[in-house]
C-alpha cells in the first residue's frame, strides 16, 4: 500500500498530463517519475483524468485535480460548489473508469485511491455513491479536496 507521501507524489506527478498535451511524451516522464517511487505506469488506463500505477499487489488510481486552463474543470468546481456533482459528467466518467480498471485487474489486488483538489472531491463522491468501488478500496486519500 502506498504511504501518504507516495500518494501525494503520485497526485503531483499526475499533473504532468495537464502540462504536456502529447500523451506519449507525458507517459515517458510519468513512467520515469513513478519508477523512482517503485511504481509501474499503466499507460492504457492513464490520462489527464485518471492515473493508474501498480506496485506489487497494489493498484493505485489517482483522480487529477483542477486544471485552471480547462473550462470543464472550472465548471465541475462550480457544480461541486452548488451541490450538483451527481449530474456532472466528470464524476460519472471517473466512476465508470474506476469500475473498469477494477474489473480488469480483478479481485485479488489491493486498491488504493487518491485525489487532489477537484480529484479529491470526485474521489469522495465516488466512494459515497458506488458501493462496488467502496467495498474493493483498501485505502483512500484526498489532498486539499474541494
Predicted regions and their residues:
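A conserved cap/lid and substrate-binding interface adjacent to the catalytic center
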Residues: 2, 13-15, 21-112, 130-146
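N-terminal trafficking/processing presequences and adjacent post-cleavage segments
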Residues: 1-7
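Short glycine-enriched nucleophile-adjacent loop
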Residues: 123-131
Amino acid at each position: 500500500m502506498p504511504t501518504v507521501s507516495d500518494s501525494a507524489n503520485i497526485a503531483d506527478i499526475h499533473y504532468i498530463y495537464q502540462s504536456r498535451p502529447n500523451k506519449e511524451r507525458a507517459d515517458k516522464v510519468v513512467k520515469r517519475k513513478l519508477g523512482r517511487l517503485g511504481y509501474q505506469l499503466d499507460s492504457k488506463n492513464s490520462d489527464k483524468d485518471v492515473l493508474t500505477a501498480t506496485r506489487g499487489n497494489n493498484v493505485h488510481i489517482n483522480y487529477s485535480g483542477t486544471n485552471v486552463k480547462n473550462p470543464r474543470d472550472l465548471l465541475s468546481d462550480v457544480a461541486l460548489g452548488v451541490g450538483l456533482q451527481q449530474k456532472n459528467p466528470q464524476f460519472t466518467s471517473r466512476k465508470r473508469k474506476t469500475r473498469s480498471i477494477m474489473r480488469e485487474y480483478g479481485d485479488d489486488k489491493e486498491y488504493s485511491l487518491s485525489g487532489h483538489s477537484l480529484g479529491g472531491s470526485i474521489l469522495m463522491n465516488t466512494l459515497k455513491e458506488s458501493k462496488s468501488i467502496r467495498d474493493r478500496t483498501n485505502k483512500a486519500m484526498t489532498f486539499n479536496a474541494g
